[in-house]
């Protein structure tokens, strides 16, 4: 599939503290956060003018799901627009609390674990053809996804019985199965629940829930573009070396605890291979595939270059070449500088605070955004593109139809209902348009429905 639909869903951690103590429960904070949403959407589960979905997920986690994107750069702009929309809700909630005499700071974290050991996710969606062998797809993908944390993990200081360690992935500790239809109870690598949100005879939606939420735009680019390339190779029938892991769940943890990428994990055929070996194999196949088929767009070439530089940097032990581009490395270097300046151990509560502050999406306060202001991290999209994505849907997919419909209905004060595939006017005629093709950005039926308002 040379043109693919992508989507990202990010759940955010939420808290409110006053002088270091928790002031409100997450439920209470979430209610304040979503009060403005409920006032205009009459619900805490809404679709927005930019085609995205914003809702309160299980456990009081605000979740933002981007509209359908058919380019990785569009996807990054829309994921970052979600951060900005939630930051707006945070500022509004903070003001409401102060107006009501409740003093404290509201925080939204784009991370994957809280201090109580709970995990919440970043889910990636990739549209695939219904006609492929889904089980085979999963088999080839799992070794890639288990080792992918080495190139796009968000990093975390993990407290273990043997002391604190720096782990490359936040999510790795919370994955319990390879392939499953559950997302919360068992937390698989790939979720198989068959909800294509498209024509079920033609498409299937691959739902990957193993990845970390990324602050870094370049890490996000590498995460999605590399996965897309592996999918394209599988779809094209490229023969891959059998890298099936003997125990993917043990392997994901072992790899997460090893920043060098050299720790060997057992393969099903009895051999052993390191995360560097496995990622190197996928990279070499992808490079060859892109060159032979002349698929080298600027985004693909940028991702391949970063993939190669990241593996080389990890192999050499000199991370300076990727300290602006890969989340876990950016954060690790930040923590190491802070520890050296203040003579702190890795288990210090001040280090844990720094670890968390990296993911704070409130730009005047969050450490990632402090680095961005200093020009210490590399960007993929600029602020203007992110600002536009807050209100303008992707223009080349079904998200455009949804966004235009919502915009007109709100302007005309019409009652409506939408989901990923349906657009419905709640009038006497109950007119509904079913949009089964996520690639289709223009549809006469939708134009007519919009014109009739």
Swiss-Prot record:
Catalyzes the covalent attachment of the prokaryotic ubiquitin-like protein modifier Pup to the proteasomal substrate proteins, thereby targeting them for proteasomal degradation. This tagging system is termed pupylation. The ligation reaction involves the side-chain carboxylate of the C-terminal glutamate of Pup and the side-chain amino group of a substrate lysine. One of its GO terms (molecular function) is ligase activity, forming carbon-nitrogen bonds. The reaction mechanism probably proceeds via the activation of Pup by phosphorylation of its C-terminal glutamate, which is then subject to nucleophilic attack by the substrate lysine, resulting in an isopeptide bond and the release of phosphate as a good leaving group. This is Pup--protein ligase. InterPro entries: Pup_ligase, Pup_ligase/deamidase. It comes from Kribbella flavida (strain DSM 17836 / JCM 10339 / NBRC 14399). It catalyses: ATP + [prokaryotic ubiquitin-like protein]-L-glutamate + [protein]-L-lysine = ADP + phosphate + N(6)-([prokaryotic ubiquitin-like protein]-gamma-L-glutamyl)-[protein]-L-lysine. Mg(2+) binds at residues 9, 55, 63. PANTHER family: PUP DEAMIDASE/DEPUPYLASE, PUP--PROTEIN LIGASE. NCBIfam families: pupylate_PafA (TIGR03686). The active site is at residue 57. Keywords: ATP-binding, Ligase, Magnesium, Metal-binding, Nucleotide-binding, Ubl conjugation pathway. ATP binds at residues 53, 66, 420. GO terms for biological process: modification-dependent protein catabolic process; proteasomal protein catabolic process; protein pupylation. Coiled coil: none annotated. Pathway: Protein degradation; proteasomal Pup-dependent pathway; Protein modification; protein pupylation. Belongs to the Pup ligase/Pup deamidase family. Pup-conjugating enzyme subfamily. Its EC number is 6.3.1.19.
């Amino acid at each position: 599939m040379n043109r693919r639909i992508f989507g990202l869903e990010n759940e955010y951690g939420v808290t409110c503290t006053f002088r270091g103590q928790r002031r409100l429960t997450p439920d209470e904070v979430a209610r304040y956060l979503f009060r403005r949403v409920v006032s205009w959407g009459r619900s805490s589960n809404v679709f927005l003018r930019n085609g995205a979905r914003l809702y309160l997920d299980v456990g009081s986690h605000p979740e933002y799901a981007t509209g359908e994107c058919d380019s990785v750069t569009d996807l990054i702009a829309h994921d970052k627009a979600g951060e900005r929309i939630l930051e707006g809700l945070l500022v509004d909630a903070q003001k409401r609390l102060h107006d009501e005499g409740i003093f404290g700071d509201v925080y939204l974290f784009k991370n994957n674990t809280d201090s109580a050991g709970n995990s919440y996710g970043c889910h990636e969606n990739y549209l695939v053809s219904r006609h492929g062998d889904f089980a085979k797809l999963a088999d080839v993908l799992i070794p890639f996804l288990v080792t992918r944390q080495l190139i796009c993990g968000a990093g975390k200081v993990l407290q273990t019985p043997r002391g604190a360690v720096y782990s490359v992935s936040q999510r790795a500790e919370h994955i319990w199965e390879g392939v499953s239809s559950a997302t919360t109870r068992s937390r698989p690598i790939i979720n198989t629940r068959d909800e294509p949100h498209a024509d079920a005879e033609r498409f299937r939606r691959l739902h990957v829930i193993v990845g970390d939420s990324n602050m870094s735009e370049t890490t996000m680019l590498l995460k999605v573009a590399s996965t897309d390339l592996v999918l394209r190779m599988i779809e094209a029938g490229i023969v891959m070396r059998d890298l099936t892991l003997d125990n993917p769940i043990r392997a994901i943890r072992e790899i997460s605890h090893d920043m060098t990428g050299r720790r060997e994990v057992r393969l099903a055929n009895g051999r052993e291979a390191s995360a560097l070996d496995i990622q190197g194999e996928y990279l070499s196949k992808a490079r060859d595939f892109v060159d032979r088929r002349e698929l080298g767009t600027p985004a693909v070439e940028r991702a391949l270059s970063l993939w190669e530089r990241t593996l080389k940097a990890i192999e050499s032990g000199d991370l300076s070449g990727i300290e602006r581009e890969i989340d876990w490395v950016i954060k690790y270097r930040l923590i190491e500088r802070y520890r050296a300046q203040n003579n702190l151990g890795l288990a210090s509560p001040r280090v844990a605070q720094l670890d968390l502050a990296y993911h704070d999406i409130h730009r005047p306060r969050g450490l990632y955004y402090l680095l961005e202001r200093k020009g210490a991290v590399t960007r993929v999209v600029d602020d203007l593109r992110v600002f536009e994505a807050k209100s303008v849907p992707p223009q080349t997919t079904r998200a455009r139809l949804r966004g235009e419909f919502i915009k007109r209905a709100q302007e005309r004060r019409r009652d409506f209902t939408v989901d990923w595939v349906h657009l419905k006017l709640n009038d006497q005629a109950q007119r509904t348009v079913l949009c089964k093709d996520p690639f289709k950005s223009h549809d006469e039926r939708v134009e007519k429905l919009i014109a009739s308002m």
